[in-house]
């Protein structure tokens, strides 16, 4: 195999201070009730992002069979997790919200808002997609986006991960990266507007450049499960954004990574290097 293939978003990592409470919450509200794996071992490969030494962690990957990527729920086992010292605001640098699949935004909002108050009324994304925002029990923000596709119908209103909302400093360079390297080459919208009609997340009423990117139909063994996904890039125009993970480790509370399902990682590594984005960590260098 000389070419690489990206089949979709396999999972998005969520660092937490309490593994079991987070997972139970994701099961109860988002239906992430199928365990793919769970272990409590040492993370040895991410040394540039874990203080230069291996770190013990308890993690699992859980999915919702309605379709979409999974949750990688991740907690340090022997190190006290370092929470973000400031309240994360719209446009801060890194993943500040995860996109979650929802077959009926209005119906799910009605259901969930009866028991969970940290959510906004439905609105629309700049590309016209119905959505609403919801914080989990530790303040991680999820953007519920309407997507009526179903992998296995379990009569749930939610599915899995279908993208991320990412704060950036240089929109044009970021669009080029996600388009050329990760295949998000379809620009669904490129606009300047406020982020939300509501203020679940600080600075939602400020002006931002927002670009929503989609990919052509993905192929691969699990592409049908993962489904379509989008990347929403957000650049602050009226404030200086902060780095969400400055002074902290990978695995600390928050959204820690987007994991793509890749065939032929060596070919992808070569391609990334040619594009000026060499791997910073390679779990299988040989």
Task: Identify the function of each model-found stretch.
Residues 238, 251-260:
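Low-complexity, glycine/alanine/valine/leucine- and proline-rich hydrophobic stretches
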Residues 165-174:
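Repeat-solenoid scaffold signature
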Residues 93-97, 161-162, 253-256:
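Eukaryotic phosphotyrosine signaling hubs
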Residues 52, 81-86, 90-92, 103:
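Post-signal peptide N-terminal segment of secreted/secretory-pathway proteins
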Residues 204-205, 212-213, 223-250:
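Flexible internal linker/loop segments at domain or repeat junctions
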Residues 1-5, 11-14, 35-41, 45-46, ...:
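Vicinal oxygen chelate
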Residues 22-27, 112, 139, 174-179, ...:
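Conserved active-site tyrosine of GNAT-family acetyltransferases
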Residues 184-186:
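Phosphate-binding active sites in nucleotide-utilizing proteins
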């Amino acid at each position: 195999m000389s070419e690489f293939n990206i089949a979709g978003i396999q999972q998005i990592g969520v660092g937490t201070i309490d593994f079991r409470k987070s997972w139970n919450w994701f099961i109860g509200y988002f239906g992430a009730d199928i365990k793919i794996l769970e272990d409590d071992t040492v993370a040895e490969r991410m040394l540039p992002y874990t203080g230069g030494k291996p770190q013990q962690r308890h993690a699992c990957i859980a999915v919702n069979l309605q379709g979409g990527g999974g949750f990688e729920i991740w907690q340090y086992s022997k190190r006290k997790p370092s929470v973000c010292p400031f309240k994360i605001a719209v446009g801060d640098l890194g993943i500040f919200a995860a996109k979650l699949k929802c077959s009926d935004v209005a119906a799910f909002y009605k259901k969930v808002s009866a028991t969970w108050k940290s959510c906004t009324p439905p609105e629309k994304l700049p590309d016209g997609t119905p959505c609403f925002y919801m914080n989990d029990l530790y303040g991680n923000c999820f953007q519920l986006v309407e997507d009526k596709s179903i992998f296995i119908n379990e009569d749930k209103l939610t599915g899995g991960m279908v993208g991320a909302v990412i704060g950036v400093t240089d929109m044009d360079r970021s669009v080029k990266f996600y388009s050329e390297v990760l295949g998000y080459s379809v620009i669904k919208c490129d606009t300047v507007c406020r982020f939300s009609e509501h203020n679940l997340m600080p600075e939602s009423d400020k002006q931002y450049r927002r670009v929503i990117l989609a990919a052509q139909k993905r192929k691969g063994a699990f592409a049908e499960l993962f489904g379509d996904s989008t990347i929403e890039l957000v650049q602050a125009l009226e404030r200086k954004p902060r780095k969400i993970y400055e002074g902290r480790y990978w695995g600390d509370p928050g959204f820690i990574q987007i994991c793509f399902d890749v065939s032929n990682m060596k070919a992808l590594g070569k391609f990334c290097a040619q594009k000026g984005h060499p791997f910073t960590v390679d779990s299988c260098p040989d």
